[in-house]
C-alpha cells in the first residue's frame, strides 16, 4: 500500500444512474461499496485507463452521500503516487472510473476492486483531479547568469599591456631621475653615478626579459586554443579591440633596441689623457666623454 503522505480530500468518483455509454450504476451498489471497502482487506489501486501495467496510487477510504438531485454519489480519498502527479501536472488522467465487483467473494455485496484514472470517464459528476496549484507562491528560481569565456583572454591581454607600460615607466625614470635631467652638485664621484646607472640598467633588462616571457606565454596559449567548428563569420568592417601579436612583437623589438643602446652608453668612460693622473676638481663634471668646468663659465 502506498505510504505517501499526499492524500486528497473526498472526491466524487461515481454517480448513480446511467453512464455516458449506456450502462447503469445503482445507488445500492454505491452504498455497498462504501460499506464494505477495507484497504487492509483488499486495496483498490489506481490504474491508468484500467490497464494493469503499473499502478498510480491507492484508494484510502470511501463514503456514499445523496446530492441535491436525489442521486447517490460515491466519494473517495485517494493517495496518488509521483507518476500520477506528473501526468496530472501535464494535463493527463484528470478523472476517475470505478471498477465494481458485484458479488465480492460470494458476499452478495459489491466491492470497489479498482479505480481507473482516465480522460474519458463513463460516470457523470466525477471530480476533476488536480494535485498541484498552478500558481504556487513562494517558489524560488535561480538567476540566469551569462558566462563570457572570452573575458579571460581580455584579462590576459590587459595584464600584458600593463606589464609593457610598467617597463616604459621604468625606462623613463632612468632617463629622468627624480623628474629632472640634472647632475647632483654634491656628488664629485662620477663612478657612483655609473654604478647607479648599471643597477638601473640591470633592472630594465630584467623587466624586458620578464615581458618577453609573458608575451611568449600569452600568445602561445592563444595559439593552442581550439577554435569552435561553427565559428560565426566575423565582420570585416569592425575595428580590432585589442593589440595584435605583430604589434606586441614590434614593441618588444623597440624595447630590445633601447636596451642595447643603453648598454653601450653605460660602458662609456670619462676620457683621461695618457700618463696624467686624474685630479678631482670642484665644479667639474663629465658628460659623454667631455669635461665641463662650471667655474669658468660658458
UniProtKB/Swiss-Prot annotation:
Q: Where is the active site?
A: 21, 50, 97
Q: GO annotations under biological process?
A: proteolysis; viral procapsid maturation
PTM: Autocleaves itself into an N-terminal fragment containing the protease activity, that remains in the capsid following maturation.
Kindly state which keywords UniProt assigns to this record, in alphabetical order.
Answer: Hydrolase, Protease, Serine protease, Viral capsid assembly, Viral capsid maturation, Viral release from host cell
**Which regions are flagged for Basic and acidic residues bias?**
223-239
Pfam families registered for this protein in UniProt: Phage_GPO
Which parts of this protein are propeptide?
1-2
Keyword Hydrolase belongs to the record: yes
InterPro entries membership: Capsid_scaffold_GpO (IPR009228)
GO molecular function list: serine-type peptidase activity
- Keyword Transcription regulation attached: no
EC number(s) stated in the UniProt entry for this protein:
3.4.21.-
Tree of life domain: Viruses
Which positions does the site annotation Cleavage cover? 131-132
Where is the stretch described as Disordered? 223-243
Q: What does this protein do?
A: Scaffolding protein and protease involved in the icosahedric procapsid assembly. Coassembles with the capsid proteins to form the procapsid, in which the scaffolding protein is found within the external shell of icosahedrally arranged capsid protein subunits. In a subsequent step the scaffolding protein molecules are cleaved by the viral protease activity.
State the similarity comment. Answer: Belongs to the P2likevirus scaffolding protein family.
- Name of this protein: Capsid assembly scaffolding protein
Q: Which organism is this protein's natural source?
A: Haemophilus phage HP1 (strain HP1c1)
Q: What is the lineage of its organism?
A: Viruses, Duplodnaviria, Heunggongvirae, Uroviricota, Caudoviricetes
